[in-house]
Amino acid sequence: MPEFKLADRLATLPPYLFAEIDRLKAEVAAQGVDIISLGIGDPDLPTPDFIIEALHKAAKNPVNHQYPSYVGLLTFRQAVADWYKERFDVELDATKEVVSLIGSKEGIAHFPLAFVNPGDLVLVASPNYPVYPVASGFAGGEVEIVPLLEENDFLPNLDAISDEKWDKCKIFFVNYPNNPTSATATPEFYAELVAKAKKHNVIIAADAAYTEVYYDEDKKPISILETPGAKDVAIEFHSLSKTYNMTGWRCGMAVGNASLVAGLGKIKENVDSGIFQAVQEAGIVALKEGEPYVKEFRKIYKERRDCVIEALEKINISCKVPDASIFVWAKTPEGYTSSEFVSKLLKETGVVVTPGNGFGESGEGYFRISLTVDTDRLKEAVSRISKL
């Protein structure tokens, strides 16, 4: 039988973080251990019934079983534009500044292909969602990490980047509310970033998937597009996944600079055929009618966050109280690397958390807890951690 060698771009990839966690989890579960998984950020709360009913109704329309538009239904894109206006007071032209995505991950993965040439520099604020550097590498880009440090509230020090690097940079990936640190961006930071990007002709790719999971009405996460001049240089990726508990539906959007949106759309029309239209129609209903349900989800996540923070404090594990996202970013106990602690925790207690170094070297010394199980299970998980 012939053997086929993987392309170099695959051979150099590290194991995908969450796939590796699933593998280890399966090994321990096979031994009969009760697993509490706080690893992957996949909401356990159900999609609201009214969204499911909208999908059911739309799926009965024969028109929705034909090929969809590559860029998405105009009605869906208009619903996105209306939602951005209501939520962030950002004006978007639905015909030019919005494109639908098969989940934001798909759009992020394809975006560098539209703008990165071999050898171009891509800056990634890290710890980071692994897709940013992988997608940039697939496009031939040279990736450099910009560390996010706790003493700077996990915001990049833009002045520490030399003018030479700014001039070489094609794309700068940022993510707020941040996965995994849960940090949020300030208007001052975004203003500084936009000014740097405009000065050096850099594209800002902002991942904003967690803006709707927040815990204080006075601390709502912001969109980079609220920043004056941001639309000149920025594209923002968003998703219905975390907001409405629709991770499996694969429905997202990219918005912002028209030429950046068009470039991404050009890639998409050559590699995919858009989102099932019934899902888009359900997405319209979610965007228009979902806020009362999202408010209830926030209350649940806040209760879970507070439960975890209180329990970690009792066992002297340090963490910053997050204002947003579905994660708690905690310091690894003294004497362990991130991977050592996570592996020991899983093997000896059955609790799955994510090692900080899985999000890049800047994540070493931390681990991430996902608030995706009920409060009783969270308490049980922290109780097991305390006995380690």
Swiss-Prot record:
Q: Which InterPro entries match?
A: Aminotransferase_I/II_large (IPR004839), DAP-NH2Trfase_DapL_Desulfo (IPR019881), DapL/ALD1 (IPR019942), LL-DAP_aminotransferase (IPR050881), PyrdxlP-dep_Trfase (IPR015424), PyrdxlP-dep_Trfase_major (IPR015421), PyrdxlP-dep_Trfase_small (IPR015422)
- One Gene Ontology term of the molecular function aspect: pyridoxal phosphate binding
Catalyses: (2S,6S)-2,6-diaminopimelate + 2-oxoglutarate = (S)-2,3,4,5-tetrahydrodipicolinate + L-glutamate + H2O + H(+)
The Swiss-Prot or TrEMBL record lists the needed cofactor(s) as: pyridoxal 5'-phosphate
Pathway named in the protein's UniProt entry: Amino-acid biosynthesis; L-lysine biosynthesis via DAP pathway; LL-2,6-diaminopimelate from (S)-tetrahydrodipicolinate (aminotransferase route): step 1/1
Could you tell me the superkingdom of the organism this chain comes from?
Bacteria
GO aspect biological process, one term: lysine biosynthetic process via diaminopimelate
Q: Which residues carry this modification: N6-(pyridoxal phosphate)lysine?
A: K242
Keywords attached to this entry: Aminotransferase, Pyridoxal phosphate, Transferase
* CDD domains cross-referenced by the UniProt entry: AAT_like
Q: Give me the residues that bind substrate, please.
A: Y16, G41, K105, Y129, N179, R368
Enzyme Commission code(s) on record:
2.6.1.83
Tell me the NCBIfam families matching this sequence: DapC_direct, PRK09276.1
Task performed by this protein: Involved in the synthesis of meso-diaminopimelate (m-DAP or DL-DAP), required for both lysine and peptidoglycan biosynthesis. Catalyzes the direct conversion of tetrahydrodipicolinate to LL-diaminopimelate.
In terms of HAMAP family, this protein maps to:
DapL_aminotrans_1
Q: What is this protein called?
A: LL-diaminopimelate aminotransferase
**Organism the protein comes from:** Maridesulfovibrio salexigens (strain ATCC 14822 / DSM 2638 / NCIMB 8403 / VKM B-1763)
Q: Which gene encodes it?
A: dapL
